[in-house]
């Protein structure tokens, strides 16, 4: 699940590329069941979404650490 600070924000607001040096290349929604490649900037993240990230391992680990 996404870090709580990501929930109910759209990708443009999060600006992950500039802030964390990672890209969201896909999102798997659980409700409704959907897999979206290259989600649009206005996509709003929900608590049960699964984010597929592209970036350096250390940068992705930093995103994962936000969940703790």
List the model feature ranges, each with a label:
Residues 2-67:
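Cytosolic Rossmann-like ligand/nucleotide-binding regulatory domains
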């Amino acid at each position: 699940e996404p870090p709580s600070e990501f929930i109910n924000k759209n990708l443009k607001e999060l600006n992950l590329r500039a802030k964390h040096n990672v890209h969201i290349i896909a999102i798997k929604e659980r409700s409704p069941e959907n897999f979206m490649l290259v989600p649009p900037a206005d996509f709003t993240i929900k608590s049960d979404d699964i984010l597929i990230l592209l970036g350096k391992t250390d940068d992705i680990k930093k995103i994962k650490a936000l969940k703790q």
